[in-house]
Amino acid sequence: MFRINNNDFKILQKYKSFLMNLDNSLENIPRKDIYLKDRIKNISLDVLKDILLCSYDTSSVKMYGTSIKANIALLDFMLERLLLKKYISEKNLYKLANELVEINKMVTGWLNNSESKFVWFTSYIWDWSKEKC
């Protein structure tokens, strides 16, 4: 099992920073919408878990990457709901959304990079097997 060093893993660092900002933003949600607050926290922790799983199991990057991107889109929608209910300011939403966009771009690049390595590896095996015959 291969593990990426967490200090060198920029996506993880960026996402941890996003989580800290998100926690500060969720403090203003009233008790009547505790479900929304808990759901946002759970989804954001699922993204963190998937990022960590990708760093430990690089063979499943595509599967976890798809989950990360879907959960980021869901977080974006839920943050918009917070703005509509006036629990966060437009400035705060803009800051959080920009961080999510940057994280999403990093994940997309990571997925594209891992796919190109997989294509290279499978074509290398295919070429090697042709030479043996």
Residue ranges and their predicted role:
Residues 1-133:
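Amphipathic alpha-helical assembly/interaction segments
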